[in-house]
């Protein structure tokens, strides 16, 4: 499936080494100011080749808006966006044309479709995420109309985990580190993996402030379930946590429950969601990324004829996919919330009366 969302819908298309990547966003209310500079800023944060901690593939990632916007405002019709691929080097993949790269989707795509685009993984490449970030930027514009702010940053690289979360600092950090005190150690881990022709995993934290209570569609489109689906649909994400996450299974109920007083919740172990519905607290979501599977160490594998081969990868690859992946995770959370915001508009009769009985 290449379409995401129920009311705020995004369809993406394109491959890593094709002409480009694009998306169509449907369901956007008319009259939303489309800030192209904000879209550009988010694309720049995800863009490759920014520093030594990301892939050296160079892409301008300039977004061309094809439809759905007139004089800076959404028209209510589908918004089409296109991002050209300008930095492809398909020759880097000639030696693995018939070889399944360990840790990649080569084998599974081949088993499903009987054919695969070996140039950078084709549709399965993380290059596709450029369209998600463009669409996510539009979703964030809608959320900002309601003072909902989505932020992201890196909370851990390898086994080095930050103890404090400073989202303002993450905006300035080369690796989007949330904890200044352990940033240099986290950078060193990435540099060490790169020197060894290896890669390293990491985790991103996404925080949403200003989210009203009531968003989520139980039972089968819960907010936490939708977030899990969105984030687990990203390349390299292997686990998602909300609030205290996995630690919750070690806690007592008296420890985990978020008690309330006249000022609201006194803690936030639930991460802003109860019963699949937002509770008005800050939404806290972690996405855990595996190490980039493209490493320059020879590995054992099979070819399309199921003959044993040695895979020797060439090209330009992220030593830690979590760094740029954090921006994509932020975009996906924004897309989920924009969708939930529109769905919630019909959840009570009084909401409809405000529109139709003025």
Swiss-Prot record:
FMN binds at residues 123-125, 235-236, 275, 290-294, 316. The gene is aroC. It comes from Helicobacter hepaticus (strain ATCC 51449 / 3B1). Homotetramer. This is Chorismate synthase. NADP(+) binds at residue 46. Keywords: Amino-acid biosynthesis, Aromatic amino acid biosynthesis, FAD, Flavoprotein, FMN, Lyase, NADP. Its cofactor is FMNH2. It catalyses: 5-O-(1-carboxyvinyl)-3-phosphoshikimate = chorismate + phosphate.
